[in-house]
Amino acid sequence: MNRTVFFVSESTGITAETLGHSLLSQFDTIDFEQVYMPYINTDLRAKALTQRMQEAADRDGVRPIVFATMLNNEIREILESGNCYYVELFEGFVEPLSRELGVPPSRKSGRSHAITKPSYYTKRIEAINFAMANDDGIRPDNFHRADVVLIGVSRSGKTPTCLYLAMHYGLRSANYPVTEEDFERGDVPQLVWDCRHKLFALTIDPQRLQLIREERRPGSSYASLARCQDDIRMAAQIYKRLQIPVLNTTSQSIEEISSHIIKALRGSGEH
């Protein structure tokens, strides 16, 4: 079953996207066609969007879902009048919270990031830069500066997890790909061993890994099931030798994987 979903906001749309994704993740039997519509901040843009909603309804045979964070009543009414199932993610909470706090809301869009301390914002930017500069084992000599180091076979989810940890937690995250060279010697370089206390392994079911690799290199030996099975098996032997935590990414979201890592780091006193 296919369903079109619009993420709509007067500002960047990050809040609508984040909350909407959390809700949609509970319905994994449906394929969602996701459309991002930030800066819908005029009547004209809102009316144009209702036309797109109608087109989606005509195409899919069912009305689209709209996740929105609209504080402008006029624009919200235009969107609600469209052929859609409208989910307002702010308004149901703003008024009750206003009554509890005893002050009126500012009704300004794009304010969800304003409460973040500048120092934390800077930390996240630095962490993102670190993750990008230390992706795919480019600089193992920098691992000692990392808060966390992920290890895993190619396409096991290392890079997106590192970026998520950087963006949402401000963690300096690096990763190291386990390669044929490591398999041949049955071990990883000393620089990886040196950071074993902050090392996490990512594994994945061979069948799932094959599908992911097939998208990248169709018909290649790299994407064959036999190669995927061998890579996972030999990597598991290395993880056992290192005696590090192993997280299976097959059926877990990046958010779930990251939460496990954060919990482990806090339990160890690293963060």
Swiss-Prot record:
Q: What is the top-level taxon of the source organism?
A: Bacteria
Q: Which residues bind ADP?
A: 152-159
* Catalytic activity reported: [pyruvate, water dikinase] + ADP = [pyruvate, water dikinase]-phosphate + AMP + H(+); [pyruvate, water dikinase]-phosphate + phosphate + H(+) = [pyruvate, water dikinase] + diphosphate
Q: Which UniProt keywords apply?
A: Kinase, Nucleotide-binding, Serine/threonine-protein kinase, Transferase
Q: Name one GO molecular function term.
A: ADP binding
The EC class name is transferase
Pfam families the record matches: Kinase-PPPase
EC number annotated for this UniProt entry = 2.7.11.33, 2.7.4.28
Q: Which family does it belong to?
A: Belongs to the pyruvate, phosphate/water dikinase regulatory protein family. PSRP subfamily.
What function is annotated for this protein? Bifunctional serine/threonine kinase and phosphorylase involved in the regulation of the phosphoenolpyruvate synthase (PEPS) by catalyzing its phosphorylation/dephosphorylation.
Q: Which PANTHER family match?
A: PYRUVATE, PHOSPHATE DIKINASE REGULATORY PROTEIN 1, CHLOROPLASTIC
Stated name of the protein: Putative phosphoenolpyruvate synthase regulatory protein
Q: Organism source for this protein?
A: Thiocapsa roseopersicina
Origin organism lineage? Bacteria, Pseudomonadati, Pseudomonadota, Gammaproteobacteria, Chromatiales
